[in-house]
Amino acid sequence: MKILALDTATEACSAALCIEGELANNGITTKYQLAPREHSRLILQMIDELLSQAGVTVSELDAIAFGRGPGSFMGLRIAAGVVQGIAFAHDIPVIPVSTLKAIAQRAYELTESENVLAAIDARMDEVYWAKYTLTGQQWVLDGEEQVISPDKLHLAETLAGQGNKWVGAGTGWASYADRLLPDSGFSLLARLEDCFPSAEVIAKLAIDELKAGNTVPAAEAIPVYLRNDVAKKPKPVVL
């Protein structure tokens, strides 16, 4: 099994190649860089380097996974365009992965907490938000992913008595921690303000999805913006 994964949804730009059966890092090699506004320049280079170093051609890939959002409008378009271009040209199935779920998975790897409050700074005084719990081997979303003002979540009330089991993760906590959890005596198990989604984590999440047959065709590699004021569709980038 060979899966190419990429993510350009936030300030972080990354690509990863998962080759099942290899021992190093669970068979995953990755390129990662915090580089706001440089994703379009970096992502194709990262992909080329990963494939070249592994001696893998695009036609050998079993699937392409990507961070489908939410996140930066431009970043999501870049990832979707690259994925569509490769998938269309080589008839490769696609696995869209939630960036908020990827943050939850990364937070779990860092803290072993199975309860994660994932928040990405959405600008415009809002956060992209999701409440995830790991049940068995699957992340379960409580409610729905949403874009919302931090003041409207009322976490101190809804999570009363549960603070010691929840981890807050993502850039939303760096920007709005005082509003997500105003001074109320409520505290989290941990707060990971610089926890970004990454292609490495997306590749890990994509393995089970591919085995279960949860893929979509290239035409359905669509970003999830959560905001409704996005009109243009990403243009495929052909490799």
Where are these predicted regions, by residue range?
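Acyltransferase
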Residues: 190-239
